[in-house]
Amino acid sequence: MLRGFYTATAGMISQQRRMELLSNNLSNANTPGYKADQSSLRAFPEMLLSKMDATSVPTTKPLKFAQNQLIGPINTGVYVQDIAPKFSQGDMRPTGNDTDFAILNQTLPENASVFFTVENTDGTQRYTRNGNFTLDAQGYLTTNNGLYVLDENNNRIQVNASSFTLQPDGTLLVNNVPQTRLGIALANNANELIRDGNGLFRASEGQQLTNANNNPNISFQIMQGHIERSNVDSAQTMADMTSAYRAFEANQKIIQAYDMSMQKAANEIGRIN
């Protein structure tokens, strides 16, 4: 009977984790460039049950040996196997701000994605789809969290002008004179990136993504005065939250039923009236 407790509890924990993930997605529905997390549930490995029985050998003095009798497999619950961002393209929203950029995917291999490159506080590179940038007091292009946006040579971008133009290939023009080009990084398998908070991603330890500019196998463009919306589907997310709640509630009722059965077994079975 205790096995039923463990199975139902595993289901409750999995649905609670799923609900937390969906709630986080919904709270970031209006965050530019946010990529929704998605989870996958997996059943624990099945257990093969067998019954130990005794069999006798007909001799002058009967001998008994233990014999296994197959009962069958039993499931032991589920768990959240994996959580990974979904890197599908978000919708474009015009803002009219010169420092707002959005990457529009055109031709990319399956599972590949491109990102803006920024410099983290420790000097390492991070990658983001949130192009809601600004200029600091020194004229450097930064994220809203103060991280420097990098060009294709991994240098900080300083704009010594109040107005500038960004071409679709990422070239930054001041008074129609090319100054630098945005650093756009290519992840051949975006699923291998590690989420780092605040809309940032990082590559595996000691690795950097390759430069996406001038790559003949891919195509994309940078849109100035636009930001990419999050790819969270609010309606579907709310429906999934309802489903997760119902599953959590069902497992909770199973535990209550087991609890009542155990109370009855402890208090009534074997009682002499």
Region spans (language model):
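Amphipathic alpha-helical polymerization modules
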Residues: 1-273
